[in-house]
C-alpha cells in the first residue's frame, strides 16, 4: 500500500511539473473556436457521465467497481435513458435552469430568481435541492434555504454536481466563478456541501 501511495505521489508531482507554468500577471489567449469546443466538451462530458454512471450509482459505496462489471452503452443510450429516467439528470437540468435565468435577467440576477426558477420547475429533485425547494415554496429564501438549520441535507453534494456550469461560463476567472458559487450554491447547500461546489466550479474555470 505504501509503495502504491508513493508511486501516485510521484506521478502527480511529475504531471504538475510538466504543466505549462504561467507567470503571475501574464495573460493567455485562446480563440473563440477553441473556447467553444472546450465548453461543448464540458457539457458533453457531464451528460454522458450522468448516463454512463447512472446504473452504478449507490451500488458500490465503499468499494471499487470491478473492471469486469458490464456497463451498458449503445448509440442511442443517452437519449433512451433521458426518456426513461429523467431524474438521473438533475446535474444537467438544474444547470440549464440557472442558465435560463441568466439569459432572461442577466448574469447579475438575484439569488431569489434562481431559487424560484428551480423550486417551481416540473422536474425531480433530490436531497439538498429537494429540501431547498420545500423551503423556498414555504417562504424560506436563500441563503437560509440552504442553511443547515433549515436544510438537513446542507452537506450533500447537490451544488457540487451542478457547479460545473459556473466554471464553463467563467473561463480562467476563478474569483468570478467563486462569486457565482457564493450566490447560487447557498440556495441549497452550506458548509462542506457548498465548499465542494466552489472547488468544482473553480476547477472547471
Predicted regions and their residues:
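Structured, active/binding-site neighborhoods that engage oxygen-rich ligands
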Residues: 21-205
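Bacterial Sec-dependent N-terminal signal peptides
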Residues: 1-22
Amino acid at each position: 500500500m505504501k509503495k502504491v501511495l508513493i508511486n501516485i505521489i510521484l506521478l502527480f508531482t511529475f504531471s504538475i511539473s510538466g504543466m505549462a507554468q504561467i507567470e503571475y500577471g501574464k495573460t493567455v489567449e485562446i480563440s473563440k473556436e477553441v473556447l467553444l469546443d472546450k465548453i461543448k466538451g464540458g457539457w458533453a462530458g457531464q451528460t454522458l457521465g450522468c448516463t454512463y454512471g447512472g446504473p452504478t450509482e449507490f451500488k458500490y459505496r465503499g468499494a471499487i467497481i470491478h473492471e469486469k462489471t458490464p456497463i451498458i452503452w449503445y448509440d442511442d443510450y443517452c437519449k433512451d435513458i433521458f426518456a426513461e429516467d429523467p431524474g438521473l439528470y438533475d446535474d444537467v437540468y438544474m444547470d440549464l435552469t440557472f442558465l435560463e435565468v441568466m439569459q432572461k435577467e442577466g448574469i447579475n440576477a438575484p439569488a431569489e430568481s434562481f431559487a424560484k426558477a428551480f423550486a417551481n420547475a416540473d422536474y425531480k429533485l433530490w436531497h439538498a435541492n429537494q429540501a431547498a425547494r420545500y423551503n423556498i415554496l414555504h417562504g424560506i429564501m436563500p441563503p437560509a434555504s440552504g442553511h443547515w438549520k433549515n436544510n438537513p441535507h446542507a452537506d450533500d453534494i447537490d451544488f457540487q454536481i451542478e457547479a460545473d456550469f459556473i466554471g464553463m461560463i467563467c473561463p480562467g476567472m476563478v474569483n468570478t466563478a467563486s462569486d457565482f458559487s457564493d450566490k447560487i450554491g447557498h440556495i441549497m447547500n452550506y458548509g462542506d456541501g457548498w465548499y465542494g461546489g466552489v472547488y468544482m466550479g473553480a476547477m472547471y474555470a
